C-alpha cells in the first residue's frame, strides 16, 4: 500500500512490497544468526551477471533493486523481476478470506498521511501493527494475528495528526 500511495502502479507496488518484506526478513535472519551476509566480492560478481539496467527505489527506507520491463518497474529478487501474479497468489494464500478487509484497512492507513510523511514514517507505523510472534529464533517464520482494529485506530490517529 505504501508504494501505491507513493505513486507506483498496482503491479509495481506489489513487487516492491514483496521485495521490502524479503529484505526485512533477511535482515532479521542475519540478526538472529540464521543467515550470513554474502561476501562483498560475491555481491559484485552477481551484479555483473545481471542483465538489463538496474535501478534502486527507496520504499520504507529500503533501497529496493528494480528493473524496467515492458509492463513497468519490477522489484528484483535474486536478480530476476518479481511476478506481480506470484505476489498476489502469496497474499491470497496467507490471508485467505481476510485479504480484502486487510487490504482495505492498510489502504486507509496509507491514505491517512501525505505521501512524503508516509514515506518517512511508514515503517514506524508498520512496527506498531505488525503481528507479534515469539522473540528470537522461536518467532522466525511464525504466524501472528494481524489486528485490523489496531490498524483502523492508527488510521484515525494519523488522520487527526495530518489534518
Roles of regions detected by a PLM:
Residues 1-163:
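Solvent-exposed interaction surfaces and binding hotspots enriched for charged
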